[in-house]
Amino acid sequence: MSKSTRRKEAGGAVPGSRVTRRELLMGAAAYAVLPPFAFSTPSAAQFFDADALEKIADRDPEAAAAFIVDAQTHVWWREGGLRTLTPSGEHFLKTLAGTRASVIGKPVPIADMGRMMFIEDMFLHSETDIAFLNSFGMRGAFDGVDLFPPREAAFIRSMAPSRIRVLGVVDPPDGQSAVDSLIYQCEELKIDGLKLYPPGPVTTGWRMDDEKTTYPLYEVLRKHGVKNVCVHKGLPGLFLEEYCHTADLARAAADFPDLNFIAFHCSFPFEAELAEHAQKAKVKNIYAEMGGLAPYMFRTPERYAQMLATVLNGLGADHVLWGTDTPVAGPPHWQILAFQAYGFPAQLVESKGYPVITPAVKRQILGGNAARLYNINVADASRAIDKDLLYKLRVDGNPLPLEVDPSKWTAG
């Protein structure tokens, strides 16, 4: 039976049942496409399109993902491990591992969340084309050394230069030391952007619009042609909530109009503040990034929809970037498929003014916007990826042995 015929028949009722064939097909496709926990909240189903789910489940070429750029990925276990941990550092890592375990359904040792997990998650188990690997500081919680230093991120980039970009990191209260470190990262490590984190329990508070603390960092970026300043906003949990709000972004964006300020996690649950501050300041260089929010698509679907509608309406579809926060939420494959099938139901579009998420909008979010901000030529990047070993391994089904059988060894 052709796909067109199957779609035509899908709307009819199943004999002896009130369930339509469309509903049955959607259920089967949903189970094939979405993660197991997607079905824990029945109201989530209204946000997924039956035709899109069916096409994805059938591997229809029409449903193939666009060029995908993941703006937020991590390695949480640096090479050589950690010598000591403060209680806050230990809590931080256990929270990350516990979150991944809740998604994939099995325990995750913290030490497994290293470079190999990153490579496998991003490039062997997902459709991601380019991943931005985020450095991470918080030295006070991790034996006086960055949890994931920029130099290690740059080294991992060298393993797959066509697939990986690097975001550097500094701690703004470090003053001149932070400036010197950023100069080194720009000149020697060739970072593609800067990632900043709000203070935690063992660090000093700072603001994005502090002329003494952060503005010198922006001047370094400007001098070296690095245009993108990323910052963790929202999701306070492990950070001091006062600094996870967004009131400090608008002035910085206005004072540095040639830089882009990207609020990670869409500043959730403070996304309305983000949109309001950008609109009041009349700045066009504030963006939102979606990392770490995909599980809310199913666990609190109405709240996720409100968040996404707020940033799309408030900032514009051309100001929202795809990100997954991998590895915390597991391999990004399920997030990509879910977003491809996602949309706002008609009643929310009509009653609340939620925007229609067209295929063109999804292409913008999944990769087009990041490609524009980071000056990635999609055609050139695609040609390079086609020749990439990781891409070939994924297309070939990753035909590498998972285990070595010593009985097959032969003496040389």
Walk through the language-model features, giving the residues of each.
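Divalent metal-dependent hydrolysis catalytic cores, especially in the metallo-beta-lactamase
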Residues: 90-113, 120-142, 163-169, 192-193
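Active-site gating/metal-coordination segments in enzymes
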Residues: 50-52, 130, 135-244, 287
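Short aromatic-enriched loop/helix-cap "lid" or pocket-rim segments at secondary-structure transitions
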Residues: 79-84, 144-145, 179-181, 206-208, ...
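Well-ordered, non-membrane alpha-helical segments in soluble/globular domains
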Residues: 108-119, 145-155, 211-215, 245-248, ...
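Histidine-centered divalent metal-coordination motifs
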Residues: 72-78, 232, 265
